Swiss-Prot record:
This is E3 ubiquitin-protein ligase Rnf220. Keywords: Coiled coil, Cytoplasm, Isopeptide bond, Metal-binding, Nucleus, Phosphoprotein, Transferase, Ubl conjugation, Ubl conjugation pathway, Zinc, Zinc-finger. Residues 485-513 form a coiled coil. The gene is Rnf220. It catalyses: S-ubiquitinyl-[E2 ubiquitin-conjugating enzyme]-L-cysteine + [acceptor protein]-L-lysine = [E2 ubiquitin-conjugating enzyme]-L-cysteine + N(6)-ubiquitinyl-[acceptor protein]-L-lysine.
């Protein structure tokens, strides 16, 4: 059987690429003749033409595995030099309609339909296999499939004439019927079509052509009319459901966009842009892409509405705060200025520009044209608002009697400072006498009870007197002056007495010292100007030299000193 099948040119790689020569056919014919049963009567021989050449690799009907070479020569015994008076077993009689005898009723199949009679159609080449694509990938070969790839077959009859079959036409066109009729005549001459087909009426031939057209379109892979995708039979249901889902989603998205566009407060520009976009959509765009774009625009519009609402909320809150603040200020003042504001607004335009007359002509003052007047031009102006009159008494003398009581010290209590020069001392005494108006000086502080050392006080007496004063001890509260230098015991006792004195000062709280004499306070005084505390003698001696606080240099008079108790 393989040798018989190898006689024709096949597209599959399992077959031989070149047809066998005529001697091989003779050998096969003689083998078949020897095995023929002599009891089977012979029938009228029928001419049969063998294809001598094929221009292109085409899907020939008898390349199918179910067809056998021996079945072609069934009851072909009358041909000289071939199978004479020999029939093949009935199991081999699986014939194509072109080679079937008249007594076999086989449904004719058009030569245009490149399909076998088996259950599975074999793929002839790699290009043919690639033409069947998935339903989810774009089609590569959508049209003009039969224009350039049409097969050219040449057949020869018994007389040696050759016939060429050229371009295939669609089965539904009128020209295809003519080609089929011409092909049938040629096949009838070559013995490839039965007498029943050639002798049939034109009506029968038209019916058979319709059946051929139906068989042609049924055998091809289906094509989706919407997205133009080739589909397999197993993908039809799934692809149809997918298209229906997209069709159902399309009206919903359109309706949602229309509702959003017709919402109250939508700007006219957005409505216009939405209508222009709907009109500008191309009809060839896929429903899935258009639905995606509509959803994207809807999301953008929702974002815009949310941002605008937030902004308006912030502005309204700020305006509300300003209004509440103004209302509070109006309530505090206790007066309503609504009527006055209305009057000002009415007369604002009339008094906006200041007019004056010069040389008999009315002119407008240029400064009133500027917003803000002189202040708008850059000049500094004083406030035009007049302060309300105040009946409060102005204290010019600085009388603090009601607040701090009567003055406790006067100018007579000040201890004057003695100068080194006689002329300067005389001037100080004259100035002091003028201030006191001839009154006697105060005796609050005497040299005997002074904390300041007498050697630091300059004196106008002779040198002997100064030496005697220098020999006197200045620390009246200490017993050190009773100690003599000759006795070490007395020195030790004096130190013990000093320690006990310091302990008593710490026990009674004398831990604060005057910053002038660096000793514990003796009758502390403070100034009502700066509230610094010093000893009485320190204040009076400082004011005798200058009328300033010894700590902060604030102007201080003797009447500003007050006695305090620590």
């Amino acid at each position: 059987m393989d040798l018989h099948r190898a006689a024709f040119k096949m597209e599959n790689s399992s077959y031989l690429p070149n047809p066998l020569a005529s001697p091989a056919l003779m050998v096969l014919a003689s083998t078949a003749e020897a095995s023929r049963d002599a009891s089977i009567p012979c029938q009228q021989p029928r001419p049969f033409g063998v294809p001598v050449s094929v221009d292109k690799d085409v899907h020939i009907p008898f390349t199918n595995g179910s067809y056998t070479f021996a079945s072609m020569y069934h009851r072909q015994g009358g041909v000289p030099g071939t199978f004479a008076n020999r029939d093949f077993p009935p199991s081999l009689l699986h014939l194509h309609p072109q080679f079937a005898p008249p007594n076999l009723d086989c449904t004719p199949i058009s030569m245009l339909n490149h399909s076998g009679v088996g259950a599975f159609r074999p793929f002839a080449s790699t290009e043919d296999r690639e033409s069947y694509q998935s339903a989810f990938t774009p089609a590569k070969r959508l049209k003009n499939c039969h224009d350039t790839e049409s097969p050219h077959l040449r057949f020869s009859d018994a007389d040696g004439k050759e016939y060429d079959f050229g371009t295939q036409l669609p089965s539904s066109s009128p020209g295809s019927l003519k080609v089929d009729d011409t092909g049938k005549k040629i096949f009838a001459v070559s013995g490839l079509i039965s007498d029943r087909e050639t002798s049939s009426s034109p009506e029968d031939r038209n019916d058979r052509c319709k059946k051929k057209a139906v068989a042609l379109f049924d055998s091809q892979a289906p094509l989706c009319p919407i997205c133009q995708v080739l589909l397999r039979p197993s993908e039809l249901q799934e692809h149809m459901e997918q298209e229906l889902e997209q069709l159902a989603q399309l009206p919903a998205s359109k309706n949602s966009l229309l509702k959003d566009a017709m919402a109250p407060g939508t700007p006219k520009s957005l409505l216009l842009s939405a209508s222009i976009k709907r009109e500008g959509d191309s009809p060839t765009a896929s429903p899935h892409s258009s639905a995606t774009e509509d959803l994207h625009h809807s999301d953008r519009y929702q974002t815009f509405l949310r941002v605008r609402a937030n902004r308006q909320t912030r502005l309204n809150a700020r305006i509300g705060k300003m209004k509440r603040r103004k209302q509070d200020e109006g309530q505090r003042e206790g007066s309503c200025m609504a009527e006055d504001d209305a009057v000002d607004i009415e007369h604002a335009d009339s008094n906006r520009f200041e007019e004056y007359e010069w040389c008999g002509q009315k002119r407008i003052r240029a400064t009133t044209l500027l917003e803000g007047g002189f202040r708008g031009s850059g000049f500094v102006m004083c406030s035009g608002k007049e302060n309300p009159d105040s009946d409060a008494d102005l204290d010019v003398d600085g009388d603090d009697t009601l607040e701090y009581g009567k003055p406790q010290y006067t100018e007579a209590d000040v201890i004057p400072c003695t100068g080194e020069e006689p002329g300067e001392a005389k001037e100080r005494e004259a100035l002091r006498g003028a201030v006191l108006n001839g009154g006697p000086p105060s005796t609050r502080i005497t040299p005997e009870f002074s904390k300041w050392a007498s050697d630091e006080m300059p004196s106008t007496s002779n040198g002997e007197g100064s030496k005697q004063e220098a020999m006197q001890k200045t620390c009246k509260n200490s017993d050190i002056e009773k100690i003599t230098e000759e006795s070490a015991v007395t020195t030790f006792e004096a130190l013990k007495a000093r320690v006990r004195e310091l302990e008593r000062q710490l026990s009674r709280g004398d831990r604060y010292k005057c910053l002038i004499c660096m000793d514990s306070y003796s009758m502390p005084l403070t100034s009502i100007q700066c509230w610094h505390v010093h000893c009485e003698e320190c204040w009076l001696r400082t004011l005798g030299a200058k009328k300033l606080c010894p700590q902060c240099n604030t102007i201080t008079a003797p009447g500003d000193l007050r006695r305090i108790y620590l």
